[in-house]
Amino acid sequence: MLLNGEDGSMTIKINHVKEYEALVEIYKKEGLDTSLFGNRIAAIIISGDKIIGLNSVPGVKIRGEEVENGVKADIEIADNVKLPFPIHLCTGYLRSEGYQKVIFNIKIGKNSIVKFTSHCIFPYAKDFSHEALTSIKVGENSWVSYEDEHIHGEGVRMISKTEIELNKNARYTGKFSLTKHRAKELKLEMIANLGERSVLELESKVKAVKDDSVEVREVAYLKGAYSRANLKSTVIAFDEARANVVNEAYGFGDYAKGHVECHEIVKGNADVQTVPLLRVKNDKAELTHEASIGRINEAQLMQLMAKGLTDEEATELIIRGLLGEY
């Protein structure tokens, strides 16, 4: 049975209210924005293989289906929609063991401006596998931002693949962050096809510790004339962690421009590899690359230590700056 307020309030399954409340409490504990659970927010709230909360707003249709081991959701944004609040995607798993698969099909119409705030909440995971497949199609002249933040326990194996299609004059900004909790085993892949004059920005930030294993792949196919892409990845690897980062940009369209930026810092016995792949098949296209890998910049360290910080404090401050944690 579904509880659906006549006033347009969040639809919550009665027999899953406790799980819903538990997720809200985790948001509070982690300092996340609990207003995202409000009635004015378009949202889907998932726990394991159940949809425990669902809310649509004018211009946004969210349809969810419970499937084996997970959930499939179709999210459609109409033309000419400008949402004042983000669309909230909450994927939770509150047990310590198991497997979860989520599939999101997202379609944005023309001339719309929307923001997605996605949280994956697996705080108690000890032996848990999570698979996420996301398809995002952005219509002409629409602007979309998608922020994906993760709260993990000690034992998460995660595979995430996102495919993005940008039509003429569309803009997409995607940010992935796993910096406050363990990665354990992470395979992250984002692939985008860019139409005429479309703009893509992808940014991934990951901190790997202990024996974590991280693989990041960002790919941009600049097919349309005057399309632009900026791919940026930051990986901080400690202890015995391993990381492999691949950034690919393909220049096909006239006057297409792409830039790849990789920053990887190694501390302890970590093993990090970064592979930039730039390919141009049009003499009017332009691709550039910037990379740094290895220890923390010595000049920055000395500068901070001259101000009274210890080596450890200076190192931590630089790392927090790279990860955007102030």
UniProtKB/Swiss-Prot annotation:
Origin: domain of life: Archaea
BP GO annotations: iron-sulfur cluster assembly
Segments forming a coiled coil: none
PANTHER family linked to this entry: FES CLUSTER ASSEMBLY PROTEIN SUF, UPF0051 PROTEIN ABCI8, CHLOROPLASTIC-RELATED
Family: Belongs to the iron-sulfur cluster assembly SufBD family.
Protein name listed in UniProt: Iron-sulfur cluster assembly SufBD family protein PH0883
